[in-house]
Amino acid sequence: MALSKEDILTWLEEAKTSEVVELITAIEEKFGVTAAAVAVAAGSGPASVDAEEQTEFDVMLMSFGDSKINVIKEVRAVTGLGLGEAKALVEAAPKAIKEGVSKADAEDIKKKLEAVGAKVEIK
């Protein structure tokens, strides 16, 4: 009697972990393969690109809160913009303050802006 792929998958869903481990060990011995090599090969396709951790972040000023002047000063310090440009950026919230920065830099900028009363999100 031949088992169908569906029968095998059903058994795997219902089997105990120890039974699955025994099956994997038997397959490794019988066919001279290792499960680690199969796992690496399965994860090396285009689907693994989606699983990668995000490396670039955008710092978004959602609102300037009660202390607009202090937020403008901090935006100037973080971005290097002039007074008028920083003021326009703050007044245009929600707006990106910095784009494509590392996670550490984004967290640092967020902390500085929140310290002066701004509402900030990292995307």
From Swiss-Prot:
Keyword Aminoacyl-tRNA synthetase: no
GO biological process: translation
One annotated Gene Ontology cellular component of this protein: cytosolic large ribosomal subunit
Key words, A-Z: Ribonucleoprotein, Ribosomal protein
UniProt xrefs under InterPro entries: Ribosomal_bL12 (IPR000206), Ribosomal_bL12_C (IPR013823), Ribosomal_bL12_C/ClpS-like (IPR014719), Ribosomal_bL12_oligo (IPR008932), Ribosomal_bL12_oligo_N_sf (IPR036235)
Keyword flag Coiled coil: no
GO molecular function: mRNA binding; structural constituent of ribosome
PANTHER family per record: 39S RIBOSOMAL PROTEIN L12, LARGE RIBOSOMAL SUBUNIT PROTEIN BL12M
Record text on subunit structure and interactions: Homodimer. Part of the ribosomal stalk of the 50S ribosomal subunit. Forms a multimeric L10(L12)X complex, where L10 forms an elongated spine to which 2 to 4 L12 dimers bind in a sequential fashion. Binds GTP-bound translation factors.
The family this protein is said to belong to: Belongs to the bacterial ribosomal protein bL12 family.
Role, per record: Forms part of the ribosomal stalk which helps the ribosome interact with GTP-bound translation factors. Is thus essential for accurate translation.
Protein name: Large ribosomal subunit protein bL12
Organism: Borrelia turicatae (strain 91E135)
Lineage: Bacteria, Pseudomonadati, Spirochaetota, Spirochaetia, Spirochaetales
